[in-house]
């Protein structure tokens, strides 16, 4: 279980040896295992995820991408579909990579393939989330497909081109307009803005 306490960033080689020893010591004390991993640090990346649907018969399609770069305390706050500031060539690579990864493992479910994209639009793979994500609704808004409904039908054995799902090819999935989702979080301004709980006492639908 990775938390922000488990992550360290160092930009100078001369800091590395000391940081390495400290990180191993902390890991050993906290988890009983002093194994650590070193990764390339990507400064100010975009967090981009590609929505995937795959059935039991080898058919897999993407439903374009979401930009989840606006985050606070390592938690997503704003999600936008599609990503508003990526080149189309970069988006096409993201789709290609997402499909290649999921086709290789014969993926059959709704899922999300997550990437980081740096300022030069180099792409780095993070992980595959084999489930529905909270932000799937922005993808539903711009594609018109009910991802939750499709997932249930896939689990029941339906193919993507079945009457219940009606995705006959990648070309059937069109992206229209933009959708934005914002999450409401609670923080205590009198306690250094630490995460807090609260009660919603009023709600007004725009």
Tell where the protein language model's regions lie, with residue ranges:
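ATP-dependent carboxylate activation and anion-phosphoryl transfer catalytic cores
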Residues: 1-206
């Amino acid at each position: 279980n990775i938390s922000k306490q488990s992550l360290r960033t160092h930009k100078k080689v001369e800091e590395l040896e000391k940081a390495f020893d400290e990180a191993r010591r902390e890991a050993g004390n906290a988890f009983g295992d002093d194994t650590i991993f070193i990764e390339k640090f990507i400064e100010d990346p975009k967090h981009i995820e590609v929505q995937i649907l795959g059935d039991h018969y080898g058919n897999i399609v993407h439903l374009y991408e979401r930009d989840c770069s606006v985050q606070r305390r390592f938690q997503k706050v704003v999600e936008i579909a599609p990503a508003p500031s990526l080149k189309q060539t970069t988006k096409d690579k993201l789709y290609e990579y997402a499909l290649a990864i999921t086709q290789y493992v014969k993926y059959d479910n709704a899922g999300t393939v997550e990437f980081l994209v740096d300022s030069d639009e180099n792409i780095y793979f993070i992980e595959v989330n084999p489930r529905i994500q909270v932000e799937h609704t922005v993808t539903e808004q711009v594609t018109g497909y009910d991802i939750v409904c499709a997932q249930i039908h896939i689990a029941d054995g339906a193919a993507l081109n079945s009457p219940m799902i009606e995705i006959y090819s990648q070309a059937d999935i069109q992206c229209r307009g933009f959708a934005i989702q914002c999450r409401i979080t609670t923080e205590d301004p009198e306690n250094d803005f630490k995460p807090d709980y609260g009660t919603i006492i009023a709600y007004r639908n725009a």
